[in-house]
A protein has these predicted regions:
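Nucleotide-activated sugar donor-binding and catalytic core shared by glycosyltransferases
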Residues: 1-385
Length: 385
């Protein structure tokens, strides 16, 4: 009997996770069919995507409100479809604000549900753990410190490691990657990663470009490289660069961040998966982030944020190895100064690379295989196999 799995991812990092899970499940059970929402990697792995993944890629309270009607319509359409064509299991890949409601309603219909990537309930809006407990039969956790928190709140969870740690290894010598990208093997290289969402690029792109201009003026011969995941983000960031810094020698690469990061001496990045990728490659980073002022002050006033750091590298380390410049601190001048603090201190960079290597080793678990085994066990238990 063919197994049908519903699956939804909302952004590029989720697309990577979802694609790995699909491939691992199909390796174990070739008869499984997948449909829902996914990006190019999930589609290539065999998922039928009923809506473009980009329609779900919005962030922040204000930004979500602007797209709320469309988001609700998509979720309603998926639920209506799966009421008729009921899947044997549903996997929500991250995107908790979209997926948890869908999971809860499908679970009420008797569909076993998995949430792949624990929401950061230990860091942000901890009250969501009740929603998570009601929505998911099983949470697949990708960070080692999450399990104790989830267990204490009655959430069934399994730590599966992080798939990027299986895929990305430290790169000590940047020369081969620079040669492949057409960059000179000598001289400083700064990787600039302004985020994977258009709203992120609009919010922090100008500050990042301003910082790049200041750094280039201080370090003659500096080269800039920016990997961009899709045409929309490339077009948005390229337009900002053309407006604010048309004279800078800047290489845009149509690829994942991990393909360009090893070429860099230092990384200037938005908060998000890119901070983990920089850690896995072993590159020091400066993290900048800014959201709509209403989003930020609402979070502050309601005490929705529970942790000291926003960068995963710092959360894993338990200390601020990567400087974090948030909201009003995220200025071109302060970002540039933080980057210079690394470019001027090779010994500091080497020590951070060593620490990042230790942290990366804790994340390597053959994640997709571990996740697939957990999913198949839940399917078998629900069917009485």
């Amino acid at each position: 009997m063919t197994l049908r799995v519903g699956i939804v991812a909302a952004e590029p990092s989720g697309d990577v996770l979802g694609a790995g899970l699909i491939r691992a499940l199909r390796a174990a059970r070739p008869d499984i069919e997948f449909e829902g929402i996914g990006g190019p990697r999930m589609i290539a792995a065999g998922c039928v995507s009923r809506f473009p993944m980009e329609t779900l890629s919005v962030m922040g309270l204000v930004e979500v409100l602007r797209h709320l009607r469309e988001l609700l319509a998509i979720r309603r359409a998926l639920l209506d479809h799966w009421r008729v064509e009921r899947p044997h299991l549903y996997v929500g890949v991250d995107a908790p604000d979209f997926n948890l409601t869908l999971e809860r309603r499908l679970r009420q219909l008797g569909v076993p549900t998995v949430h792949y990537v624990s929401p950061t309930v230990w860091a942000w809006r901890p009250g969501r753990v009740k929603t998570l407990r009601a929505a998911a039969d099983l949470v697949l956790s990708i960070f080692p410190f999450e399990g104790d928190f989830l267990a204490a709140h009655g959430v069934a969870a399994r730590y599966v490691g992080h798939p990027l740690a299986d895929e990305i290894r430290p790169v000590a010598d940047p020369a081969p990657v620079r040669a492949r990208l057409g960059l000179p093997t000598g001289g400083p290289v700064l990787a600039v990663l302004p985020g994977s969402r258009l709203s992120e690029i609009g919010a922090i792109g100008p500050s990042f470009i301003g910082a790049a201009r200041l750094i280039a003026a201080r370090y003659p011969g500096l080269r800039l490289v920016t990997p961009l995941v899709n045409a929309a983000t490339r077009e948005r960031f390229a337009a900002l660069r053309a407006e604010l810094a048309p004279d800078l020698d800047w290489l845009f690469v149509d690829s994942a961040a991990q393909d360009a990061l090893p070429a860099a001496d230092v990384v200037l990045t938005a908060s998000g998966t890119a901070t983990l990728e920089a850690l896995l490659v072993g590159r020091p980073m400066v993290v900048g982030y800014r959201v709509h002022a209403l989003t930020y002050w609402t979070a502050r006033l309601l005490r929705l944020v529970q942790v000291r750091h926003i960068a995963m590298a710092n959360l894993l380390a338990g200390e601020g190895l990567a400087p974090e410049l948030v909201q009003g601190e995220c200025t071109a001048e302060k970002l540039a100064a933080a980057v210079a603090g690394f470019l001027d201190a090779p010994q500091r960079c080497a020590e951070i690379g060593r620490r990042y290597g230790e942290l990366a080793a804790r994340l390597r678990r053959d994640t997709s295989r571990e996740a697939a085994a957990a999913v198949l066990s839940l399917i078998e238990a629900s069917r009485g196999d």
